[in-house]
Amino acid sequence: MGILTRIWEGNFVYQEPICFSEDAEGHIAGGQLLYQPEHILSVTSFDSSVFYEEGTDYIREDSRLILTEHSRIPILSRDIYCKPFTGVPETAWVRLPDGKHYMEVVSDVYRWQILVTYTHKTVWDSFSPVDSSSLLPQSMQKLQNGGDFHLVFYGDSITAGWEASGCNESAIDMVTLEDYHVTLWHAPYQPAWAELVSNSLQHRYPQSNIIKKNRAAGGSTVQWGVENAKELVCPCNPNLVILGFGMNSMQEPAKIYKAAILSIIQTIRSEHPDC
């Protein structure tokens, strides 16, 4: 059991991250877990260097952890993540309702996170992903037969691996469309999700040689994806493409977003119909 354990299955949760933060009234928010723990196995700092103790650093209240008065668990103060809005267009999309402040994207927010590992008896009653591999018969057949398998990731900064603590990705510059290296190395040293998926596929299909290509670009929108799919993705000779756009297109109407995703798929399949 580890980082790829399915959170919607079983009764074990590994290192669920939570963050305590200060709200506008000075109250401490956070501490909510996905499930109500039966047994908490560990509560640690983001780098596992500090082990927090129940009763000393926190208490349990149903599915929440509550900080004690003298807890060692860090609190993200409001002045760190909430800044005065000065009219800079790049921050307008995260402006708060009062119009005077905006939410800062704190690149090292992980320093305020704690990791909770626990067991539970709760049944997952929300959305559960299902196996849809039957919709990709050519890709699945290729994986099962073995040989070189070209896996391409195409999306925004999350797919590129930005802020993953163990990121080591070759991604794309959104403006120049040139390759560049994204590297981060700090605890807990977790690879970008594209690397995790690639490694998992390689483990599951050892007869195949998974060749990963990351064509994602930080800051890119789904419309950028439409404009550059032919140049960036098609030359990779993909057997499977995983799209990861959306974070920078949150203001797009659903219809336009869906049409853009379909356009990317059509562009790729026009040259690679078996993908």
Role assignments for model-derived ranges:
Residues M1-Y154, T159-H186, H203-S208, C236, ...:
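N-terminal secretory targeting modules
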Residues N214-A216:
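Residue-level recognition of beta-strand->loop/alpha-helix junctions
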Residues Q144-N145, S170, P191-I211, S220, ...:
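Alpha-helical cap/lid subdomain in secreted, periplasmic
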